[in-house]
From Swiss-Prot:
Protein name per Swiss-Prot or TrEMBL: DNA repair protein RecO
Organism: Streptococcus agalactiae serotype Ia (strain ATCC 27591 / A909 / CDC SS700)
Gene3D superfamilies: Nucleic acid-binding proteins (2.40.50.140), Recombination protein O, C-terminal domain (1.20.1440.120)
Membrane-spanning segments: none
Family assignment from sequence similarity: Belongs to the RecO family.
Family matches, as Pfam families: RecO_C, RecO_N
UniProtKB keywords: DNA damage, DNA recombination, DNA repair
Length: 253
């Protein structure tokens, strides 16, 4: 085994034998790994075994089996997220999305930092629905999906009232609408936002203000994109879909 010091985000844990746990952690430098924690309920690591906990870990890495946690410090527990069902549901979804986007034991520091920053912004109170949309758009390439939301697939002009074409897997400008009789007839303003989401840097993001009607259009479009081009169906996504139907009863103004 080798020793590695790295930041990590706990994805989930599950019971193993009587009092042990298997804990999956997405680390910045070692990728996603499964860790064995003996006597977890009595372990000094119990505080950092919960999902959506970030810490600086000292790890014993086994490339051919289970790894071990040696120590930890600098714990970030996302108290605001964990105290709000809606924030927690969306945070759990993007975490699950990151989990399925890459293989185990493969380092992806860029994705780790992106996920960590997204969670921090949700914790800070920025719009969790739009942050989730941005995460979904920028994660598409991890699934091998390269869609251009910037310019027309035929003439490459930008800044026009575009529509999306499944036939050409891209945007059509008004001069080329005729190329696809089954184009989606989408709101061009929504596609403009999707284009911005594709390239936005979180360091530049101070506030988010998107009307509910536009949020719904974005949600429906991204659901369509993920269904057709990615094809994954996560339990955490179904849960946030259900929130839209019954969650308003619980949501405070």
């Amino acid at each position: 085994m080798r020793v590695s010091q790295t930041y990590g985000l706990v994805l989930y844990n599950r019971n193993y034998r009587e009092d042990d746990k298997l804990v999956k952690i997405f680390t910045e430098t070692e990728g996603k790994r499964m860790f064995f924690v003996k006597h977890a309920s009595k372990s000094k690591f119990n505080a950092v075994l919960q999902p959506l906990t970030i810490a600086h870990f000292i790890l014993k890495i086994n490339d051919n089996g289970l790894s071990y946690i040696d120590d930890y410090k600098e714990v970030l527990a996302f108290q605001e997220i964990n105290s709000d069902l809606f924030k927690l549901s969306y945070a759990s979804y993007i975490t699950s999305l990151a989990d399925v986007a890459i293989s185990d034991n493969v380092a992806d520091a860029q994705l780790f930092i992106f996920l960590k920053k997204t969670l921090e912004l949700i914790e800070d109170g920025l719009d969790y629905e739009i942050l989730t949309n941005i995460f979904e758009v920028q994660l598409l390439e991890r699934f091998g999906v390269a869609l251009n939301f910037h310019d027309c697939v035929f003439c490459h002009r930008a800044g026009l009232p575009f529509d999306f074409s499944h036939k050409y897997s891209g945007l059509l400008c008004p001069n080329h609408y005729y190329k696809d009789e089954r184009r989606n007839h989408l709101d061009p303003n929504m596609l403009h936002l999707i284009n911005r989401f594709q390239s936005i840097q979180f360091d530049d993001l101070q506030t988010i203000s998107v009307k509910p009607e536009m949020k719904l259009k974005i949600r429906q479009f991204l659901d369509m994109i993920y269904d057709e081009y990615v094809g994954i169906h996560l339990k955490s996504k179904k849960f946030i879909d259900d929130l839209s139907s019954w969650g308003s009863i619980m949501k405070s103004d």
